Amino acid sequence: MNNDNLNMAPPQELTKQYLKRFSTVIKMAMIAILVLLLLIPLSMVRSVLRERLDRRDAAVKEITSTFGSEQVVMGPALIIPFKCIQKTWKDQVVNDRVERREVIETVRKRAFFLPEVFKAAGRLDPRGLHRGIYETVVYNGTLNLSGSFAAPSFEEWSVDPKQVLWNEAEIAISITDLRGATESLHIKIAGQMVSLVPGNKLQGVKGGVYARIVGLNDGMDRIPFAMSLTLNGSRSLRFAPIGVNNDVQLSSTWPDPSFQGAFLPAGREVSADGFNAHWQVTYYGRSYPQQWLDNIPADSNGIASSNFGVDLLPTLDSYRYVERSIKYGILLIVLLFTAFFLFEILSAVRIHPFQYTLVGVALCLFYLGLLALSEVASFGVAYWIGAAVSTLMITLYSIKALKSAGRGGIVAVGLVLIYAFLYVILRLQDYSLLVGTAGLFLVLAIVMYVTRNIDWYARDNA
């Protein structure tokens, strides 16, 4: 039919002819619009996921608040007070006038010294604690800390040795959550065993213990220390590189560690039976000095940025996999809608947009079911149960919609392949982009091959 005949036709007939002529383009546009609309239920599922994550985080917080939170161990640090002469300017009233005068006064300051050598050896015994359906990893850690301080020197501050208050020296250790300490804490320093009491003596850190030390003097060459502690915590353990040279060894039966922080282990062994890790760190990788005065507070951000240690990851974080799978939801919808559209093109079957909508909603419900099932079962089991239910629903519906059991069987096989393809992508975290791209090229090649002989203009004009 040429353009002259179209122009001579009545308006109503003309509209029908145009709709018929561009029916394929219109159908493709409707499918594209429907795909975009299905992003709405997918976003709603994503919103439900965020809500469940918030509930999980709240449950984990309740567990850790009673057992022990993520622990960071910093110290010990030696604190020695001293007296010095300080000149300041102060406003004084003289003869009813305010004058600014120089005042010389004796003030008290504290000097902080970090150890020259710091060693830590520990073992973490992990287990899972539940709050309802939610679980978090907690551990009981046995740590042995040792090392030595160099002889404290006040020369850089020009302090008179006679003004150093050696008899008021203190030793301080920062432990993030002291609720995790399961027994009394003691430290052996300079040959004497002292008990540690709660009190935060270090700036820029949270929580800590300290003790008064007697017997220190300016004639000591080196001050050794050693202590053992049993510490409850959850999910992670960190150390601060407080020594000039730091040597830390950790072992555990947890099979899925994640080594985090400013320094990675110099050596590690990870297997299904657990892990062993060994750090050798110098003080060059941190931003705070080896000694300072209390009028130069340590930067808390700088301290945290140089910490190192290990996270005890859950063996399988189902929420993480569900979140990744939802990101592929639009791909799943496009692939299945492409298959339905090809059935329309290659056969006389016509599929109504409402039927496309029902199939799309079924695909979206798969992700909601996956989220619900993954909270009570492993992700793999939840995925394939959800995939089986979704495939069964869509297949039975397709048999009627496509008016053929054979075509419904093709849809079933296609869905199984698509779900298997997405599952492989989810499991292959490092190579998911490569495998996913290769799969899309394969799908595009199949579509191009199947439609290679279609004369689209002739089909619309038929």
What annotation goes with each model-predicted range?
Residues 1-20:
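N-terminal Lys/Arg-rich, disordered targeting/topogenic segments
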Residues 20-47:
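Hydrophobic alpha-helical transmembrane signal-anchor segments
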Residues 23, 302-333, 352-353:
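Cytosolic-side membrane-insertion boundary helix
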Residues 42-46, 315-326, 424, 428:
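Glycine- and acidic
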Residues 44-70:
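Alpha-helical transmembrane signal-anchor/signal-peptide segments
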Residues 54, 58, 65, 79, ...:
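Soluble non-transmembrane domains of integral membrane proteins
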Residues 61-89:
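Short extracytoplasmic
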Residues 330-462:
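Generic detector of multi-pass transmembrane helix bundles and their immediately adjacent loops
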